[in-house]
Amino acid sequence: AEMIREKLGNSPLADACIDSVENGASTIYALPVKETTHGKISKADHQGTGKGTIEASGNPTNDFTLIVQIETSGLTNAATCVISENGGQSWGDEQTIPLSVTITVPNTGVTLTFTASEGNQFVAGDTYTFEATAPAANNGDILDAVKKFRSYMVTVELIHVVGTSTAALWGSLESLGAAME
């Protein structure tokens, strides 16, 4: 899994390849398709009594739920937090909310901006939850990738398209698949 993430990043394609290997695939050819729609990150769903705020920005690399939990109350450079990139299943190390007010969450494409002032501090136990959506490719880019793959002259059992798709894409893929037989 680690080697796949090194090659493909924290992406839906990496997730699909890892799932395939874990379920018995012995050979995988992975062809990333350039995103045409950037990932999106929601506004914070804040639970708790603190008045400090956190905003998320950037272009998420995958679908995930990002949670910031305040561990120690206070202003920036005093309050501490932990961050989960998987909806609270696991947590990163406790870190001080920096005076520079931003934390870049590694391998996610997301930067968090923290704001606090006297009377508007972070409070221990508060959580800030963000929903991220993965980037997406358009139908034309996916079809071009399948055509490019065809030029590799390798025998394949199936082609797995990762991401959101439409009926129009599947109709086009069916026609292309028939031509490839």
Where are these regions (language model features)?
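Surface-exposed assembly/interface segments
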Residues: 1-181
